[in-house]
């Protein structure tokens, strides 16, 4: 199984990339994690709809066919660590590759959000995009550790 994190925005601070890389290398070989950063559409005088369309096209191009799409959305389902671990286990049992989508500064195209297989949220807080990448991969690693009985997660 592969977890694909698709994030709108190509540039993150070094600290965020270092933290992301640290968690990414902890995953076992049977659960590969890949990050695909797609370009943020330059704002200029474009409408939000134009921005959404351009970014959606890039996101869709980054996702292989047949991949389960899970978007991070402030209106998505709020999950506990245990619930995320159960979701991860379900995806693994189904053999699905999963793409977790982090939108750009203006969010995601509403139709794309609605078409996703699932919508989840990481927090009630507004977080910087670089922090979301780190928080997401850490929580995915934590979910894996719960399922694997690894001592990383403690009750």
From Swiss-Prot:
Q: Which Pfam families match?
A: SPOUT_MTase (PF02590)
Q: What class of enzyme is it?
A: transferase
The subcellular location is: Cytoplasm
Note the InterPro entries from the entry.
Alpha/beta_knot_MTases, RlmH-like, tRNA_m1G_MTases_N
Keyword terms: Cytoplasm, Methyltransferase, rRNA processing, S-adenosyl-L-methionine, Transferase
Q: What is its EC number?
A: 2.1.1.177
Q: Which reaction does it catalyse?
A: pseudouridine(1915) in 23S rRNA + S-adenosyl-L-methionine = N(3)-methylpseudouridine(1915) in 23S rRNA + S-adenosyl-L-homocysteine + H(+)
GO function terms (MF aspect): rRNA (pseudouridine-N3-)-methyltransferase activity
Q: Does the keyword Methyltransferase apply?
A: yes
Q: Which GO terms describe its cellular component?
A: cytoplasm
Q: Which residues form the signal peptide?
A: none
For binding S-adenosyl-L-methionine, which residues are annotated in this chain's numbering?
72, 103, 122-127
Oligomeric and partner information: Homodimer.
Q: Family per UniProt?
A: Belongs to the RNA methyltransferase RlmH family.
- Function, please? Specifically methylates the pseudouridine at position 1915 (m3Psi1915) in 23S rRNA.
Q: What is this protein called?
A: Ribosomal RNA large subunit methyltransferase H
């Amino acid at each position: 199984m592969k977890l694909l994190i698709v994030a709108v925005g190509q540039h993150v601070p070094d600290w965020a990339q270092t933290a992301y890389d640290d968690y990414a290398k902890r995953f076992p070989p049977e659960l590969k994690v890949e990050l695909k950063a797609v370009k943020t559409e330059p704002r200029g005088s474009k409408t939000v709809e134009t921005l959404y369309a351009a970014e959606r096209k890039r996101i869709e191009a980054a996702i292989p066919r047949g991949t389960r799409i899970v978007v991070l959305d402030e209106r998505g389902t709020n999950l506990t660590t245990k619930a995320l671990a159960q979701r991860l286990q379900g995806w693994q049992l189904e053999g699905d590759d999963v793409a977790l989508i982090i939108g750009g500064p203006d969010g995601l195209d509403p139709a794309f959000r609605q078409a996703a297989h699932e919508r989840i949220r990481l927090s009630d807080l507004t977080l910087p995009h670089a922090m979301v990448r780190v928080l997401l991969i850490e929580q995915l690693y934590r979910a894996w550790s719960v399922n694997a009985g690894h001592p990383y997660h403690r009750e």
